[in-house]
Regions:
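Active-site microenvironment of metallo-dependent hydrolases
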Residues: 1-286
Length: 286
């Protein structure tokens, strides 16, 4: 409406908003009215006010003059949304990081920000394995692919959570929303990951015991319970991680962005550590 009011030809304005946009983003079956394209159409009264008269979806009239067609029913299959956490068979060995290197890359949290630092820290080696060092606030992190059964597990280390004797896990991890786990020992990391299979959500584990769990059964992202239930469970999760010594107000917020490998500097995906500035997978060893 604004473009036409400013003098742009109506046909060109419609092309820019439909066909040009579809072509730009590679939507091959959308953007124009042609054979073999999706019959998703909007019928306007005129080319000035653009008041919508009819809406067609997949060749069916679904709304007229702003009113939904009473016969229009959802064809969505919600079963997959309630069955979205599919973890591989996990053991403590799944979280093992072999190595004898002196220096490793560590993700450094910056409180209140989504960006991270790339820290180079001295590795703690025990029996040929690189392990967490909670006394120096260097915890182990894992990102486990949960959608397609790839068995991918990315492993790394992170500094800034500052808790001991436990692990946290979440299925909220932008943008792929895999299972992200942080802990100071492999046993608790295993329990935390298994706790989220298949209900998803967020949890806190210590000494093999689940201290708190907020289930998020819808795609691992949302709850089907009343808001009061969600608030109580979320508060219990936060209280539990604070008991373990974490000073962050809500550690699940930075955790949810650590797998997001488009925000600098160092992130962890299910394929491994990502140097976002270089857009490359990088090794743990420096």
């Amino acid at each position: 409406r604004k473009a036409i009011a400013l003098g742009l030809d109506p046909i060109l304005a419609i092309c820019i908003a439909t066909k040009h946009a579809a072509d730009h983003y590679g939507f091959q079956r959308r953007g124009s009215i042609e054979p073999n394209l999706l019959a998703n159409l909007i019928v306007f009264d005129d080319l000035n006010n653009f008041r919508v008269r009819q809406t067609w979806y997949h060749g069916k009239l679904v709304a007229t003059n702003g009113v939904m067609n009473a016969l229009c029913t959802s064809e969505l299959d919600w079963s997959t949304a309630n069955d979205s956490v599919h973890l591989p068979k996990l053991t403590e060995q799944s979280f093992c990081v072999k190595g004898k290197t002196e220096l490793i890359r560590v993700i450094g949290l910056i409180e209140g920000q989504l960006i991270t630092e790339e820290l180079h820290e001295r590795a703690k080696i025990e029996q040929g394995k690189c392990v967490a060092d909670a006394n120096r606030d260097i915890l182990k992190m894992a990102v486990i692919e949960r959608h397609h059964g790839t068995n991918n597990i990315g492993l790394g280390f992170v500094k800034g959570f500052s808790f001991q004797h436990g692990a946290i896990a979440s299925t909220v991890g932008h943008d792929a929303h895999n299972v992200a786990v942080v802990g100071d020992n492999d046993a608790d990391m295993l329990v935390a990951a298994q706790t989220l299979n298949p209900q998803g959500g967020q949890c806190v584990v210590s000494d093999g015991r689940v201290l708190a769990h907020l289930p998020l059964p819808i795609a691992g992202l949302m709850s089907d319970e009343p808001s009061e239930f969600v608030i109580d469970k979320q508060q219990a999760v936060l209280e539990a991680i604070h008991i373990l010594g974490c000073p962050l107000d809500d550690p699940f917020m930075p955790l949810s962005f650590l797998p997001l490998s488009v925000i600098p500097k160092l992130k962890l995906s299910d394929l491994g550590l990502v140097d976002v500035e270089q857009f490359q997978i990088v090794p743990l060893e420096v």
